[in-house]
């Protein structure tokens, strides 16, 4: 797992977390990515809609595990929030950054959720979308069996809903074309 933490440094650098920031992760469920990304003195709001799998014990396990990998205690804190398919239940005008990791393609009500998310970001805040990319159009996700979004489809959905694409980082994992991407958007 030390190697995984080293690989994640590329992602951590892209997110540019800073001490004192307030970050939300929507669709957080097991919270292991958020724990890996936890910079010093960041406040995390961890949100999910499935309270049967979104458990404090899982978060505590992940937080402790990554503290061991980091070689020092976590100084970030977290709050658990249960939302629903149309609303995050997060506080408004609060977040420097919002993450959606490998779950945006699962949203049943994408437009409603993006409208809700726009209210949650502070002025100048960034929304990060981390998704696997299909090798071909119409490909289904290997875990949830839902359609994956192409790079172009993802950007189009966000632009249609009042966001602009700022930047992105591709992950090829020894493939010829990217198989995963983190997109960065801000409100237009």
PLM ranges: what are they?
Residues 2-21:
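Conserved alpha-helix/loop element of class I SAM-dependent methyltransferases that forms part
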Residues 22, 43, 124-126:
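Short glycine-centered segments of the SAM/dcSAM-binding site in methyltransferase folds
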Residues 24-88:
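Class I SAM-dependent methyltransferase SAM/SAH-binding core
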Residues 86-98:
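A short acidic, Gly/Pro-enriched loop at the edge of an enzyme's catalytic core
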Residues 95-110:
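A short SAM/SAH-binding and catalytic strip from SAM-dependent methyltransferases
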Residues 111-126:
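A short glycine-rich, Lys/Arg-flanked "PGG" loop and its adjoining helix->strand segment in the class I
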Residues 125-183:
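C-terminal alpha-helical "lid/dimerization" subdomain adjacent to the S-adenosyl-L-methionine
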Residues 184-188:
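C-terminal lobe and adjacent flexible extensions of AdoMet/dcAdoMet transferase-like proteins
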């Amino acid at each position: 797992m030390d190697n995984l933490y080293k690989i994640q440094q590329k992602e951590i650098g892209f997110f540019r977390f800073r001490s004192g920031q307030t970050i939300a992760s929507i669709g957080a469920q097991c919270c292991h990515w958020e724990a890996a990304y936890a910079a010093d003195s960041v406040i995390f709001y961890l949100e999910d809609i499935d309270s049967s799998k979104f458990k404090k014990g899982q978060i505590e396990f992940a937080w402790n595990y990554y503290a061991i990998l980091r070689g020092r205690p976590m100084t970030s804190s977290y709050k658990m929030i249960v939302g629903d398919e149309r609303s995050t239940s997060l506080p408004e005008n609060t977040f420097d950054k919002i993450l959606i990791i490998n779950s945006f393609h699962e949203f049943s009500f994408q437009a409603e959720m993006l409208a809700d998310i726009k209210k949650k970001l502070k002025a100048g805040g960034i929304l990060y979308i981390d998704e696997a990319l299909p090798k071909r159009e119409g490909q289904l996700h290997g875990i949830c069996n839902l359609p994956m979004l192409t790079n172009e489809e993802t950007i189009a959905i966000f632009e249609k809903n009042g966001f602009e694409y700022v930047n992105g980082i591709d992950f090829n994992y020894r493939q010829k074309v990217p198989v995963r991407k983190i997109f960065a958007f801000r409100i237009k």
